[in-house]
A protein has these predicted regions:
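Small-residue-biased structural context
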Residues: 1-145
Length: 145
């Protein structure tokens, strides 16, 4: 059973905003360290950023998939398609994080790795916006004329 914060738009939105804000800040900090040529510290910051994605963003995705999405579909079976798309977004985020972990071991903080970190931000922002729209906004009822 999903916790109450997942079921309320304002609380769910706050979780999304907090998670994304933290990821943006940590990404910017890592990039600033690279600009200052603090490569060792930047690499540590990248490791912390990966951990942040796993423990904050992806753990939220896991919680959604472990009950919240099922509850939403049980309440409205028409949401099954939307939930499938949202779950796919989570899979994309997981894949990007896994790719970053492999690439960073092979190439360090290469431009490709930095692009992947930015891809996470974009996918997550779009996913959160779509999730809030698809699962929380009530459809406008058609007026009978």
């Amino acid at each position: 059973m999903a916790g109450p914060s997942l079921r309320q738009l304002h609380a769910h939105h706050a979780i999304h905003e907090g998670g994304l804000s933290g990821a943006v800040t940590k990404t910017e900090e890592m990039e600033e360290l690279l600009e200052m040529k603090e490569f060792e510290v930047a690499r540590q910051a990248a490791d912390h950023l990966i951990d942040y994605w796993e423990t904050r963003i992806l753990s939220h995705a896991d919680a959604e998939e472990d009950g919240f999405y099922q509850e939403m579909v049980e309440g409205n079976p028409d949401l099954a398609g939307a939930v499938a798309k949202l779950t796919r977004d989570h899979d994309i985020l997981r894949t990007i994080v896994a790719d970053i972990k492999v690439r960073i071991k092979e190439t360090g903080l290469s431009p490709e790795v930095l692009q992947q970190f930015h891809a996470l931000l974009v996918v997550n922002a779009i996913h959160s916006r779509d999730e809030e729209r698809l699962l929380f906004e009530q459809p406008v009822q058609k007026r009978q004329v």
